[in-house]
Regions:
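Intrinsic disorder at enzyme termini
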Residues: 1-13
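Generic alpha-helical structural signal
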Residues: 10-17, 44, 111
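N-terminal glycine-rich anion-binding loops that anchor highly charged ligand groups
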Residues: 15-24, 50-52
Length: 125
């Protein structure tokens, strides 16, 4: 079994790592590195950072604003987030509610809810 990554995968990994090293919000990085609990605003800032980088919809189809990444790219992305000591991504909107809406929702529901879930303007509590 070959479990090595392709050159494209390694380049993708480096792009993510570089983006995190250069652009990850410093106030969140400092708290994470010191083990200080993040506030709600910190978590929102982190998610908005992901959105601005084009990474918030890491597991969403392109047609709904996602990245369209492969499973290998998603794996590498999540590994790089962990390596950079990023906070966990809040799962409810992006990983639970959003996919149900884009899979089973009608067009009105998709238009109304998906953009705000992706931008973290609306989320499940």
């Amino acid at each position: 079994m070959d479990i090595s990554f392709s050159e494209q995968d390694l380049q993708f990994k480096e792009e993510i790592r570089s983006g995190l090293e250069n652009d990850f919000p410093s106030h969140i990085r400092e708290k994470q590195n010191q083990g200080i609990a993040l506030t709600k605003d910190d978590r929102i800032d982190f998610h908005k950072f992901l959105y601005e980088k084009g990474w918030a919809g890491y597991n969403w189809p392109v047609k709904y604003g996602g990245t369209g990444w492969s499973l290998v790219q998603i794996y590498l992305f999540l590994n790089e987030l962990a390596y950079a000591n990023c906070p966990t991504i809040l799962p409810f909107g992006l990983n639970m509610v959003g996919p149900v809406i884009y899979t089973y929702g009608n067009q009105h529901q998709k238009d109304k809810f998906l953009p705000d879930i992706l931008k973290f303007n609306s989320w499940c509590k």
